[in-house]
Amino acid sequence: IHSVKTGYAGGLPDGHNHHGQYNVRHYRNVVETAAKYHTTLDVHEPIKDTGIRRTYPNMMTREGARGMEWNAWSEGNPPEHHVMLPFTRLLAGPMDYTPGIFDIMYERAKNSPYRKQWNMKDSKDCRINSTLAKQIANWVILYSPLQMAADMIENYEGHPAFQFFRDFDADCDWSEALAGEPGEFVVIVRRAGEKYFLGAATNEEAREV
């Protein structure tokens, strides 16, 4: 066995802020203990980025901003969100946004008998404010050395666009931002060995770059 997905989830201890001293110490203890046992971490709902990954590179990636999951129970992330993150959150290090949803209208999910309503904002109108092309481009734009195909398996089976995920190499050794403006658009190219990957995205305004 080369890898195991495990972890824990739970509420905050009473009286403690998510980014307060209690949780910062807990977070650091988790990172140090994982390093001791040669365990890589992909953390969701982390504390603010502090540069700890420079000391403990086993802290491979983290969420730390509104990720893809936000689209499941709200009006969703607006189109400009994806082209703001490279200029804000991603300056602090890799982000596990979990891009790559193919069923952007949730047509299969809405008809599922197992669907669970999270809150009043989670309605039949929920969708991802994106295109399929942008979902694929975000694998390049929103850098993370560990990427996952976050949609249901049924939405990938037989889909020709899934070939990009098969070909993609997240272990990039060179990156360059070719063009962009915060919240407007971004164009990023990355190299992994002899492979080059280019991702470009815009907000809700059409444009040529």
PLM segments and residue spans:
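Flexible loop/turn segments at secondary-structure boundaries
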Residues: 11-15, 48-53, 104-106, 148-150, ...
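Short, well-ordered loop/turn elements at secondary-structure boundaries
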Residues: 36, 142-143, 192-194
